[in-house]
Regions:
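Aromatic-anchored segments of alpha-helical transmembrane domains
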Residues: 1, 68-69, 139-152, 191-205, ...
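Alpha-helical transmembrane segments of multi-pass membrane proteins
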Residues: 1-6, 73-76, 252
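Juxtamembrane membrane-water interface segments that cap and precede transmembrane helices
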Residues: 9-16, 91-105, 267-278
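Interfacial loop-to-helix transition and helix-capping segments at the boundaries
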Residues: 17-29, 103-117, 149-169, 199-219, ...
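Transmembrane alpha-helical segments and their boundary/interface "anchor" motifs
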Residues: 22-31, 43-80, 90-106, 238-249, ...
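Membrane-interface junctions at the ends of membrane-embedded or membrane-associated helices
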Residues: 43-51, 131-132, 174-187, 223-238, ...
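Solvent-exposed interhelical
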Residues: 120-143, 172-190
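Alpha-helical transmembrane segments of multi-pass integral membrane proteins
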Residues: 205-309
Length: 326
């Protein structure tokens, strides 16, 4: 009975941890797309179509399709080899049962690497309508509301609609956001106003506030600025340079290491042990993230040579310097 109680508490802890991760992810993604828009700003505003069509949009769509197919094949193979059956019912291109289902889910951005698809679409729209950036921002804000309230169906289209507004802010209003993120007296009133606006949607039972996401962006920028003042941030820069291989490869390693570890623990009835359940609940998320990240970088280091470079960069860009950027 005591073992069952401990196991239940560990399960509740994992459930609460999952909810926390979902909340953090919901606030992290706006910051990611804001920074992506900031980095794409010069290409969108100053560079001609001829110079950026392949290096930006074509490259992003190419990587999205390529790694979507690789993940689908690898995850299907891993699931079949280890369990002999499909164990996930997630609506995701990586778990598609047929080729037509894979294509449909990929087109709908219901793929693990959906953010590559989103960046390509955002870049295209921002470039096309850069002279009408304010109306485009307002449209993006409306799309954000429709996505958050799930008026737009399916999680893939919802994701595409939800984060466009933050890419727009990074592209066309980054200077204002960066100034607002500084700890200055004159920024006190705007911050207070944002705090009030961030809490207002709760009165109307909205799922998530656009203003709360903007606050998360400001806090993230301010935190990074503060850390950069007291540390070299070399480790964070290293992670940033390897974001693409870590992101596209980690899903495959999560399936392999995760399923292998879970099946091993079940086979030896380790989850019946209270100490193991708590150890698993506390350490597994950290260990699996570190293990998958290191494995992803290792594979990238081994394959990012010669023809293998086409796994991470559109073939016609291989001879050009610079790592694929958002």
């Amino acid at each position: 009975m005591q073992t069952l109680s401990n196991g239940t508490r560990a399960h509740e802890y994992l459930a609460n941890l999952s909810d926390l991760i979902q909340l953090i992810s919901g606030l992290f993604m706006p910051a990611f797309f804001f920074v992506s828009g900031l980095l794409a700003r010069n290409a969108i505003i100053d560079r001609p179509w001829k110079r950026i069509a392949t290096s930006r949009m074509t490259n992003l769509f190419y990587l999205y399709l390529l790694w979507g197919a690789i993940q689908w094949g690898a995850i299907t193979g891993i699931s079949t080899e280890i369990t002999g059956q499909r164990i996930s019912q997630n609506i995701n291109a990586a778990y598609a049962g047929t080729f037509s289902e894979f294509l449909t889910l990929t087109f709908l951005a219901m793929s693990t690497s959906w953010y590559l698809y989103a960046l390509g679409i955002y870049f295209l729209l921002a470039k096309l309508f850069q002279r009408y950036n304010l109306p485009l921002l307002l449209m993006a804000a409306v799309l954000n509301y429709l996505a958050v309230e799930k008026i737009i169906p399916y999680w893939g289209p919802q994701s595409l609609a939800q984060y466009f507004v933050f890419f727009m802010l990074g592209t066309f209003w980054c200077s204002q956001i960066l100034r607002l993120s500084e700890w200055r007296r004159q920024n006190g009133l705007p911050w207070l106003l944002l705090l009030l606006l961030a809490g207002l949607p709760a009165l109307f039972d909205f799922d998530r506030s656009l203003f709360l996401s903007v606050l998360a962006i400001l806090i993230s920028v301010a935190a990074c600025r503060g850390l950069n003042q007291v540390s070299s941030m070399a480790w964070l820069n290293w992670i940033g340079r390897h974001t693409l291989p870590i992101y596209v490869l980690h899903r495959i390693f999560i399936e392999y290491f995760g399923m292998t570890a879970i099946l091993f623990a079940q086979r030896h009835q380790l989850f019946a042990l209270a100490w193991f359940s708590w150890l698993w609940a506390c350490l597994y998320p950290l260990v699996i993230v570190a293990l998958c990240s290191l494995a992803s970088v290792a594979v990238w280091s081994l394959t990012n040579h010669g023809v293998g470079r086409a796994l991470f960069r559109f073939p016609t860009l291989i001879k050009r310097p610079a790592y694929p950027a958002a």
